[in-house]
Protein backbone atom coordinates (compact mmCIF):
# COMPACT_ATOMS: atom_id res chain seq x y z
CA UNK A 1 0.00 0.00 0.00
CA UNK A 2 2.83 2.39 0.90
CA UNK A 3 4.58 1.70 -2.39
CA UNK A 4 1.28 2.30 -4.27
CA UNK A 5 0.78 5.55 -2.39
CA UNK A 6 4.32 6.65 -3.19
CA UNK A 7 3.80 5.89 -6.90
CA UNK A 8 0.56 7.88 -6.88
CA UNK A 9 2.33 10.84 -5.28
CA UNK A 10 5.03 10.70 -7.97
CA UNK A 11 2.39 10.49 -10.72
CA UNK A 12 0.43 13.35 -9.16
CA UNK A 13 3.59 15.45 -8.78
CA UNK A 14 4.48 14.76 -12.41
CA UNK A 15 1.01 15.80 -13.52
CA UNK A 16 1.24 19.02 -11.49
CA UNK A 17 4.67 19.73 -12.99
CA UNK A 18 3.33 19.18 -16.52
CA UNK A 19 0.36 21.48 -15.90
CA UNK A 20 2.69 24.15 -14.49
CA UNK A 21 5.03 23.74 -17.47
CA UNK A 22 2.12 24.05 -19.89
CA UNK A 23 0.93 27.19 -18.11
CA UNK A 24 4.43 28.68 -18.37
CA UNK A 25 4.54 27.77 -22.07
CA UNK A 26 1.14 29.34 -22.65
CA UNK A 27 2.30 32.49 -20.85
CA UNK A 28 5.40 32.65 -23.05
CA UNK A 29 3.33 32.11 -26.20
CA UNK A 30 0.82 34.75 -25.11
CA UNK A 31 3.65 37.21 -24.49
CA UNK A 32 5.18 36.47 -27.90
CA UNK A 33 1.81 36.88 -29.63
CA UNK A 34 1.23 40.16 -27.78
CA UNK A 35 4.64 41.45 -28.87
CA UNK A 36 4.01 40.34 -32.46
CA UNK A 37 0.59 41.99 -32.35
CA UNK A 38 2.10 45.28 -31.17
CA UNK A 39 4.75 45.07 -33.89
CA UNK A 40 2.11 44.25 -36.50
CA UNK A 41 0.15 47.36 -35.56
CA UNK A 42 3.10 49.66 -36.34
CA UNK A 43 2.32 49.86 -40.03
CA UNK A 44 1.28 52.80 -42.16
CA UNK A 45 -2.17 51.84 -43.41
CA UNK A 46 -3.89 53.51 -46.36
CA UNK A 47 -7.58 52.92 -47.13
CA UNK A 48 -9.33 54.00 -50.34
CA UNK A 49 -12.94 54.37 -49.19
CA UNK A 50 -15.48 53.79 -51.95
CA UNK A 51 -17.31 57.11 -52.32
CA UNK A 52 -18.61 56.33 -55.81
CA UNK A 53 -16.24 58.40 -57.91
CA UNK A 54 -15.41 60.99 -55.25
CA UNK A 55 -12.31 60.89 -53.07
CA UNK A 56 -11.68 59.77 -49.49
CA UNK A 57 -8.23 58.42 -48.66
CA UNK A 58 -7.76 57.47 -45.01
CA UNK A 59 -4.33 56.87 -43.49
CA UNK A 60 -3.31 55.60 -40.06
CA UNK A 61 0.31 56.14 -39.00
CA UNK A 62 2.41 53.71 -36.93
CA UNK A 63 1.72 55.95 -33.90
CA UNK A 64 -2.03 55.55 -34.46
CA UNK A 65 -2.72 59.06 -35.77
CA UNK A 66 -5.25 59.41 -38.57
CA UNK A 67 -5.08 61.50 -41.74
CA UNK A 68 -8.08 61.79 -44.05
CA UNK A 69 -7.62 63.35 -47.47
CA UNK A 70 -11.05 64.41 -48.79
CA UNK A 71 -14.47 63.24 -47.64
CA UNK A 72 -16.52 62.32 -50.70
CA UNK A 73 -19.95 63.67 -51.59
CA UNK A 74 -22.60 65.51 -49.51
CA UNK A 75 -25.21 63.49 -47.65
CA UNK A 76 -24.99 60.54 -45.31
CA UNK A 77 -23.83 57.76 -47.66
CA UNK A 78 -20.17 58.71 -48.06
CA UNK A 79 -19.78 60.05 -44.51
CA UNK A 80 -21.26 56.78 -43.26
CA UNK A 81 -18.85 54.72 -45.32
CA UNK A 82 -15.85 56.73 -44.12
CA UNK A 83 -17.05 56.38 -40.52
CA UNK A 84 -17.47 52.62 -40.93
CA UNK A 85 -13.97 52.16 -42.35
CA UNK A 86 -12.46 54.48 -39.74
CA UNK A 87 -14.12 52.88 -36.72
CA UNK A 88 -14.67 49.25 -37.72
CA UNK A 89 -11.67 48.58 -39.95
CA UNK A 90 -9.07 51.05 -38.69
CA UNK A 91 -10.20 51.13 -35.05
CA UNK A 92 -10.29 54.93 -34.87
CA UNK A 93 -12.31 57.20 -32.61
CA UNK A 94 -11.25 60.49 -34.20
CA UNK A 95 -9.89 61.96 -37.42
CA UNK A 96 -6.77 63.80 -36.26
CA UNK A 97 -6.04 65.61 -39.53
CA UNK A 98 -8.43 66.34 -42.40
CA UNK A 99 -6.97 67.60 -45.67
CA UNK A 100 -9.40 69.00 -48.23
CA UNK A 101 -7.68 69.16 -51.60
CA UNK A 102 -10.17 71.58 -53.19
CA UNK A 103 -13.76 72.78 -53.04
CA UNK A 104 -15.70 70.49 -55.32
CA UNK A 105 -18.59 68.62 -53.75
CA UNK A 106 -17.14 65.15 -54.31
CA UNK A 107 -14.10 66.10 -52.23
CA UNK A 108 -15.41 68.27 -49.38
CA UNK A 109 -19.12 67.38 -49.32
CA UNK A 110 -18.92 64.60 -46.74
CA UNK A 111 -16.92 66.56 -44.15
CA UNK A 112 -19.80 68.18 -42.26
CA UNK A 113 -21.87 64.96 -42.05
CA UNK A 114 -18.75 63.08 -40.92
CA UNK A 115 -18.18 65.64 -38.14
CA UNK A 116 -21.58 64.62 -36.77
CA UNK A 117 -20.44 61.00 -36.58
CA UNK A 118 -16.94 61.40 -35.12
CA UNK A 119 -14.65 64.23 -33.92
CA UNK A 120 -12.39 65.97 -36.44
CA UNK A 121 -9.13 67.57 -35.35
CA UNK A 122 -7.31 70.12 -37.50
CA UNK A 123 -8.51 70.88 -41.02
CA UNK A 124 -6.01 71.79 -43.75
CA UNK A 125 -7.13 73.40 -47.03
CA UNK A 126 -6.45 76.36 -49.34
CA UNK A 127 -8.74 78.58 -47.26
CA UNK A 128 -12.50 78.57 -47.72
CA UNK A 129 -13.38 80.60 -50.85
CA UNK A 130 -15.70 83.58 -50.46
CA UNK A 131 -17.17 82.85 -53.91
CA UNK A 132 -17.37 79.94 -56.32
CA UNK A 133 -13.75 79.01 -57.10
CA UNK A 134 -14.69 77.80 -60.59
CA UNK A 135 -15.54 79.88 -63.65
CA UNK A 136 -18.97 80.89 -62.38
CA UNK A 137 -17.70 83.34 -59.73
CA UNK A 138 -21.13 84.87 -59.08
CA UNK A 139 -22.86 81.55 -58.40
CA UNK A 140 -24.75 82.09 -55.09
CA UNK A 141 -25.33 78.35 -54.62
CA UNK A 142 -21.68 77.71 -53.73
CA UNK A 143 -21.89 79.85 -50.57
CA UNK A 144 -24.83 77.72 -49.41
CA UNK A 145 -23.06 74.48 -50.31
CA UNK A 146 -19.88 75.36 -48.43
CA UNK A 147 -21.63 76.68 -45.29
CA UNK A 148 -21.86 73.30 -43.48
CA UNK A 149 -18.12 72.80 -44.07
CA UNK A 150 -17.40 76.31 -42.85
CA UNK A 151 -19.45 75.95 -39.66
CA UNK A 152 -18.72 72.32 -38.71
CA UNK A 153 -17.06 71.73 -35.35
CA UNK A 154 -13.32 71.05 -35.63
CA UNK A 155 -10.27 71.60 -33.42
CA UNK A 156 -8.69 74.15 -35.73
CA UNK A 157 -8.05 75.26 -39.31
CA UNK A 158 -4.80 75.75 -41.21
CA UNK A 159 -4.22 77.20 -44.69
CA UNK A 160 -1.84 74.99 -46.65
CA UNK A 161 1.57 76.31 -47.66
CA UNK A 162 3.75 74.21 -49.99
CA UNK A 163 6.75 72.93 -48.06
CA UNK A 164 4.87 72.76 -44.75
CA UNK A 165 4.46 69.43 -42.97
CA UNK A 166 1.92 67.81 -40.67
CA UNK A 167 3.00 67.62 -37.00
CA UNK A 168 2.96 63.82 -36.87
CA UNK A 169 4.00 61.79 -33.84
CA UNK A 170 6.82 59.29 -34.18
CA UNK A 171 6.91 55.93 -32.44
CA UNK A 172 9.63 53.51 -31.41
CA UNK A 173 10.09 50.48 -33.62
CA UNK A 174 9.00 52.28 -36.78
CA UNK A 175 10.72 54.43 -39.39
CA UNK A 176 10.05 58.16 -39.48
CA UNK A 177 6.63 59.04 -40.91
CA UNK A 178 5.87 62.34 -42.60
CA UNK A 179 3.47 64.28 -44.80
CA UNK A 180 4.71 67.25 -46.81
CA UNK A 181 2.48 69.58 -48.80
CA UNK A 182 4.06 69.90 -52.25
CA UNK A 183 1.37 72.00 -53.97
CA UNK A 184 -1.64 74.15 -53.16
CA UNK A 185 -3.47 77.05 -54.81
CA UNK A 186 -1.20 76.79 -57.88
CA UNK A 187 1.95 77.21 -55.80
CA UNK A 188 4.62 74.54 -55.46
CA UNK A 189 7.35 73.31 -53.17
CA UNK A 190 10.85 74.47 -54.06
CA UNK A 191 12.92 72.10 -56.17
CA UNK A 192 15.72 70.24 -54.35
CA UNK A 193 19.04 72.08 -54.38
CA UNK A 194 21.18 71.10 -57.31
CA UNK A 195 18.29 69.41 -59.11
CA UNK A 196 19.09 68.70 -62.75
CA UNK A 197 16.74 69.29 -65.66
CA UNK A 198 14.12 66.56 -65.94
CA UNK A 199 14.95 64.46 -69.05
CA UNK A 200 11.19 64.12 -69.71
CA UNK A 201 10.70 67.92 -69.74
CA UNK A 202 9.23 69.29 -72.97
CA UNK A 203 7.95 65.92 -74.19
CA UNK A 204 4.23 66.57 -73.62
CA UNK A 205 2.31 69.65 -74.87
CA UNK A 206 0.24 71.74 -72.47
CA UNK A 207 -3.56 72.02 -72.50
CA UNK A 208 -5.82 75.06 -72.44
CA UNK A 209 -5.63 76.75 -69.03
CA UNK A 210 -7.88 75.12 -66.44
CA UNK A 211 -9.86 77.83 -64.63
CA UNK A 212 -11.57 75.41 -62.24
CA UNK A 213 -10.66 74.73 -58.62
CA UNK A 214 -9.18 71.39 -59.69
CA UNK A 215 -6.02 73.26 -60.67
CA UNK A 216 -5.77 74.60 -57.11
CA UNK A 217 -5.69 71.10 -55.61
CA UNK A 218 -3.53 70.45 -52.56
CA UNK A 219 -0.91 67.78 -53.29
CA UNK A 220 0.64 65.71 -50.50
CA UNK A 221 3.69 63.46 -50.34
CA UNK A 222 3.44 60.84 -47.58
CA UNK A 223 6.55 58.98 -46.44
CA UNK A 224 7.51 56.19 -44.06
CA UNK A 225 11.24 55.62 -44.13
CA UNK A 226 12.02 55.11 -47.82
CA UNK A 227 8.39 54.56 -48.83
CA UNK A 228 6.73 57.41 -50.77
CA UNK A 229 3.03 57.91 -51.64
CA UNK A 230 1.70 60.76 -53.81
CA UNK A 231 -1.85 62.14 -53.56
CA UNK A 232 -2.57 65.23 -55.70
CA UNK A 233 -6.36 65.36 -55.47
CA UNK A 234 -7.75 66.55 -58.81
CA UNK A 235 -4.65 68.44 -59.95
CA UNK A 236 -4.90 69.02 -63.69
CA UNK A 237 -2.60 68.71 -66.69
CA UNK A 238 -0.64 71.98 -66.72
CA UNK A 239 -0.22 72.06 -62.94
CA UNK A 240 0.95 68.44 -62.98
CA UNK A 241 3.63 69.48 -65.45
CA UNK A 242 4.79 72.31 -63.19
CA UNK A 243 5.47 69.77 -60.44
CA UNK A 244 8.11 68.07 -62.55
CA UNK A 245 9.14 70.56 -65.24
CA UNK A 246 11.78 71.87 -65.88
CA UNK A 247 13.04 70.05 -62.76
CA UNK A 248 11.33 67.28 -60.81
CA UNK A 249 10.19 68.78 -57.49
CA UNK A 250 8.72 65.48 -56.30
CA UNK A 251 11.27 62.81 -57.14
CA UNK A 252 10.17 59.23 -57.61
CA UNK A 253 7.42 57.52 -55.61
CA UNK A 254 6.27 53.99 -54.83
CA UNK A 255 2.52 54.53 -55.01
CA UNK A 256 0.61 57.05 -57.12
CA UNK A 257 -3.05 57.82 -56.43
CA UNK A 258 -4.31 58.40 -59.95
CA UNK A 259 -5.19 62.08 -60.22
CA UNK A 260 -8.77 63.25 -60.72
CA UNK A 261 -10.27 59.73 -60.68
CA UNK A 262 -8.50 58.95 -63.95
CA UNK A 263 -10.08 61.76 -66.00
CA UNK A 264 -8.59 63.02 -69.25
CA UNK A 265 -7.83 66.57 -68.07
CA UNK A 266 -5.35 65.11 -65.58
CA UNK A 267 -2.74 62.33 -65.52
CA UNK A 268 -0.22 64.08 -67.70
CA UNK A 269 2.21 61.38 -68.90
CA UNK A 270 5.02 63.80 -68.06
CA UNK A 271 4.10 63.64 -64.37
CA UNK A 272 3.51 59.89 -64.23
CA UNK A 273 6.74 58.97 -66.03
CA UNK A 274 8.71 61.44 -63.91
CA UNK A 275 7.50 60.14 -60.54
CA UNK A 276 7.76 56.57 -61.92
CA UNK A 277 5.51 54.72 -59.44
CA UNK A 278 5.52 50.97 -58.89
CA UNK A 279 1.80 50.86 -58.05
CA UNK A 280 -1.14 53.06 -59.06
CA UNK A 281 -4.50 53.21 -57.29
CA UNK A 282 -7.47 54.85 -59.05
CA UNK A 283 -10.44 56.11 -56.99
CA UNK A 284 -12.81 56.05 -59.95
CA UNK A 285 -16.55 55.37 -60.17
CA UNK A 286 -18.67 52.93 -62.17
CA UNK A 287 -18.70 55.25 -65.17
CA UNK A 288 -16.57 58.15 -63.93
CA UNK A 289 -12.86 58.25 -64.62
CA UNK A 290 -10.60 55.53 -66.02
CA UNK A 291 -10.63 57.39 -69.34
CA UNK A 292 -8.72 56.03 -72.35
CA UNK A 293 -5.98 58.68 -72.16
CA UNK A 294 -5.40 58.31 -68.41
CA UNK A 295 -5.43 54.52 -68.64
CA UNK A 296 -2.98 54.64 -71.55
CA UNK A 297 -0.67 56.95 -69.60
CA UNK A 298 -0.53 54.39 -66.79
CA UNK A 299 -0.04 51.45 -69.16
CA UNK A 300 2.78 53.26 -70.97
CA UNK A 301 4.71 53.95 -67.76
CA UNK A 302 7.29 51.15 -67.61
CA UNK A 303 7.86 51.40 -63.85
CA UNK A 304 4.26 50.46 -62.99
CA UNK A 305 3.93 46.80 -61.99
CA UNK A 306 0.32 46.83 -60.78
CA UNK A 307 -2.68 49.07 -61.47
CA UNK A 308 -5.52 48.99 -58.92
CA UNK A 309 -9.02 50.47 -59.24
CA UNK A 310 -11.78 51.12 -56.70
CA UNK A 311 -14.35 50.37 -59.43
CA UNK A 312 -14.51 48.55 -62.71
CA UNK A 313 -15.19 50.93 -65.57
CA UNK A 314 -18.67 49.85 -66.74
CA UNK A 315 -18.78 52.12 -69.80
CA UNK A 316 -18.73 50.56 -73.26
CA UNK A 317 -14.96 51.19 -73.48
CA UNK A 318 -14.43 49.05 -70.38
CA UNK A 319 -13.21 46.08 -72.41
CA UNK A 320 -10.06 48.04 -73.22
CA UNK A 321 -9.84 50.49 -70.32
CA UNK A 322 -9.77 48.37 -67.17
CA UNK A 323 -7.11 46.63 -65.18
CA UNK A 324 -7.53 42.90 -64.48
CA UNK A 325 -10.55 42.10 -62.27
CA UNK A 326 -8.17 40.74 -59.64
CA UNK A 327 -7.01 44.32 -59.01
CA UNK A 328 -10.48 45.91 -58.82
CA UNK A 329 -12.34 46.31 -55.51
CA UNK A 330 -15.89 46.68 -56.91
CA UNK A 331 -17.11 45.07 -60.12
CA UNK A 332 -20.87 45.54 -60.06
CA UNK A 333 -23.44 48.20 -60.92
CA UNK A 334 -24.25 50.87 -58.26
CA UNK A 335 -27.39 49.16 -56.98
CA UNK A 336 -25.43 45.96 -56.32
CA UNK A 337 -22.22 47.58 -55.06
CA UNK A 338 -20.92 46.44 -51.65
CA UNK A 339 -18.42 49.32 -51.40
CA UNK A 340 -15.29 47.27 -50.78
CA UNK A 341 -12.33 49.33 -49.52
CA UNK A 342 -8.88 48.80 -51.04
CA UNK A 343 -6.15 48.76 -48.38
CA UNK A 344 -2.39 49.19 -48.50
CA UNK A 345 -0.11 48.49 -45.52
CA UNK A 346 3.52 49.62 -45.30
CA UNK A 347 5.83 47.70 -42.97
CA UNK A 348 7.16 49.58 -39.96
CA UNK A 349 10.61 49.91 -41.53
CA UNK A 350 9.11 51.24 -44.77
CA UNK A 351 10.94 48.62 -46.84
CA UNK A 352 7.90 46.87 -48.31
CA UNK A 353 4.14 47.28 -48.65
CA UNK A 354 1.17 45.03 -49.33
CA UNK A 355 -2.02 45.84 -51.24
CA UNK A 356 -5.15 43.96 -50.13
CA UNK A 357 -8.40 43.66 -52.09
CA UNK A 358 -11.12 42.49 -49.66
CA UNK A 359 -13.52 41.47 -52.42
CA UNK A 360 -11.42 38.50 -53.53
CA UNK A 361 -8.78 38.38 -50.76
CA UNK A 362 -6.10 39.29 -53.31
CA UNK A 363 -2.86 40.25 -51.59
CA UNK A 364 0.36 41.35 -53.26
CA UNK A 365 3.57 42.60 -51.67
CA UNK A 366 6.05 45.00 -53.26
CA UNK A 367 9.52 46.10 -52.21
CA UNK A 368 10.04 49.81 -51.68
CA UNK A 369 12.27 51.13 -54.44
CA UNK A 370 15.43 53.16 -53.99
CA UNK A 371 14.78 56.85 -54.57
Predicted feature residues:
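Cysteine-centered motifs
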Residues: 7-8
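Bacterial N-terminal signal peptides
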Residues: 26-37
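Flexible, acidic/histidine-containing loops and adjacent segments that form or flank the divalent-metal
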Residues: 41-44, 108-236, 303-370
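Long, structured stretches of catalytic cores involved in phosphate-ester chemistry, encompassing
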Residues: 124, 129, 244-334
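Divalent metal-coordination and catalytic microenvironments
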Residues: 50, 59, 70, 102, ...
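Active-site metal-binding motif and surrounding structural segment of the metallo-beta-lactamase
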Residues: 44, 62-68, 72-125, 131, ...
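Active-site environment of divalent metal-dependent phosphoester hydrolases
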Residues: 55, 75-76, 103-109, 129-133, ...
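Conserved beta-strand hairpin/beta-sheet module of binuclear metal-dependent hydrolase folds
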Residues: 41-94, 213-237
Amino acid sequence: LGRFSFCCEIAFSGEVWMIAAMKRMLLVLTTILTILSVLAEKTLDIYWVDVEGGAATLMVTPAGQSILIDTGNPGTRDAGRIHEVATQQAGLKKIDFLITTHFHGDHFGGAAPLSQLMPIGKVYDNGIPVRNPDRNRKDPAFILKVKPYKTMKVDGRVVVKPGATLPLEQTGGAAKVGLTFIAGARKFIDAPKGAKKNPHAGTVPSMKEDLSDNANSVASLVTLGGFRFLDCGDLTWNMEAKLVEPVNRVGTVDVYQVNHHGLATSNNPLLIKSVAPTVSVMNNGHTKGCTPSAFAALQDTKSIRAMYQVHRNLRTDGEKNNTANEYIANLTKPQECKAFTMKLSVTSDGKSYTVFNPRNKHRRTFKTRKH
